[in-house]
Amino acid sequence: MPWAWNLVDQLNSVLFSLRYGHKLKKFRFKTPHKNYQIIPICNIPTDALVKFFAHQPNEAYKFFRPHGFDPKSIQRLKENKAFLAYVLIEESSGHIVGYFFNRSFFHGKGFRGRMVDINYRGRGIGTMMNCLLNEVGFSIGLRLFETVNKNNEASYKSAISASKVKVIDKMANGDLYLEILII
């Protein structure tokens, strides 16, 4: 019943926009990020996002499966007002070096996710993107959460480096369900 989930997503998008849209219109990232541009995915061509995801190695998807990566799925996300997603673009090359999002809900929760391009790992970009997600999420009044697997060392370190966290649950698959706390 994918149509039912699509309907729920559309309803959530409308309700989220009614509740948080005015705050999002006023929001601007406070911290300038030298050498990078932060662009909402609605302003990025769908094929550029699909190409970014296709460029990542299979191991990048072992712990990262938040949505489909095909053109139709990406286009649907771009139209969803509750899916606060951005890319980080390196100014010198124009390359997308990271993708990050808060999957948000009208009742006030958001779930963080991010992916750093394979060629840009180990530079602190994941931690930077987490800080940006905190900035937008907390500024509009969301409670933020994340699931992260301790076996995914880079993502785990990024989550705890960027934020004060509270472990809500240790899940059977090894994931930790974290609440991101305002510092």
Predicted regions and their residues:
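A conserved beta-turn-beta hairpin within the catalytic core of GNAT-like acetyltransferases
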Residues: 103-112, 121, 173
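Conserved GNAT acetyl-CoA-binding A-motif
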Residues: 137-149
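C-terminal "cap" of GNAT-fold acetyltransferases
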Residues: 170-183
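A short, internal acetyl-CoA/4′-phosphopantetheine-binding micro-motif in the GNAT/acyltransferase core
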Residues: 113-123, 149
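Conserved acetyl-CoA-binding loop-helix of GNAT-fold acetyltransferases
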Residues: 122-137, 157, 161
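A short beta-loop-alpha structural element at the N-terminal edge
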Residues: 35-51
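Conserved active-site alpha-helix within GNAT-family acetyltransferase domains
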Residues: 150-169
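Acetyl-CoA-dependent GNAT
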Residues: 59-109
